Amino acid sequence: MRDAENIREVEALGIDMMGFIFWPKSSRYVSERPAYLPTRCKRVGVFVDENTETIKQIADDYALDIIQLHGSESPDQISHLPFLTSRLSIVKAFNIATTEDLVATKLYEGSVDYFLFDTKGKSVGGNGEKFDWSVLSTYKGETPFLLSGGIGPEDANRVKVFHHPKCIGIDLNSRFELAPGHKDINKLKTFIQSL
């Protein structure tokens, strides 16, 4: 999300969180602060293998509520982010294709507030590809998670019937865009109303 008017329109839909990508290799990269930042939903900063000082600076500059780590950050690295854990929630993303991919979550139990389960794809997130959600039935961890990975307008019924005691929400990204970083308000509105 980069465009102030688009941010306002998405926020008006009553969403809980809005993501801002701070990974320079992403087509959704936020290179400069938008003229408007949301005030009625949580601001999520998405980082990929970023250094601690940069995360801290951006978290302060954007008044972030949540940090999403979408790279190969280790539990040890996360434990060295005390400035985050005292005032911000942390989400650790995992790329999922099979039940074996869920094993790594055990190392992060107690280190983060939420997991995000995304599709294992060619790039880091935003691939627009789905994974088989049935593999999540084997997830028995204590950490709540967000469901991600190519969820599109056609998936409303799938989302409605998906149940897991630790699933707290869904992440909508590339399948709801007019262009990278610019959401299609009509698609989002229709999808949200259908839930």
Where are these regions (language model features)?
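Conserved N-terminal beta1-alpha1 strand-loop-helix module at the mouth
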Residues: 1-195
